[in-house]
Amino acid sequence: MDSDDPRRVETIEDNETGFLELRHVNVARGERVVLHDVNLTIRAGEHVAILGPNGCGKSTLILAMTCQIYPMVEPGMAVRIFGRERWDLTQLRRHFGVVAAGLLSELPGERTAVTTGLDAVIAGFFSASTLWPNLHVTGEMRDRAREALERMEALHLAKQLVGEMSAGEKRRILIARALVHRPRQLLLDEPSNALYLAAQRELRETLRRLAQEGTGLVLVTHHLGDILPEIERVILMRDGRIAGDGPRAELLTEARLSELFNAPVRIGRDEEWLHSW
């Protein structure tokens, strides 16, 4: 397979079992430090929720985790993904899928309304904004795009125009774009943001199935309802710092969350799901 082939995936050695390792990570925006001495390790295949209020540093942490910004160079600082400090970002995306709510406006066909769901997912192989005529699309790519749509229970969207889809349908297309590479780990930023209640529940059930099939999930959110039953580890963030890291039963308490959000939080349970008010 040619080195420029978008299906080509750089091999990860079997002993590189850790997905993410952050050591003494500090990030500054201008003169203000927005991440303070973050130390974090996530195993490959582990399901984790990163929970915190708006403005706590979650978005900056995502940028650091995905090599889109770089921490301050200091003694002991390290950012390793699957055991490596240096990655070609195109290759990294084939092991580590990222789905951010802000990407909805950049979804292929969002502005032109001429791209189908299937073409939008195929374009994910090329990290392209649309399926340009000069891109060489193979039968295998089309098969894997359909497979990704099927995993997202969105095969019915294959022929539908992206510009005519609801927010929930577009979210499924975005996730399918990440899944075409069959990544080992998937990061979702505010996965239920801007979705109505039924669409939230449907998406969360689909994400549960991905977790059960073996895709490691990292959910970054400020909604307690986004924390799937499969997620056993929770990381709390506040003021650019890790405020807690441990089993969900220990951290998802009314006392801890009230302190985290600086407001009274009440927790209820609906079958396996948690919700707050």
In which residue ranges do the predicted regions lie?
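Conserved ABC ATPase signature
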Residues: 135-136, 161-165
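Catalytic Walker B motif of ABC-type/P-loop ATPase nucleotide-binding domains
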Residues: 186-190
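ABC ATPase nucleotide-binding domains
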Residues: 258-277
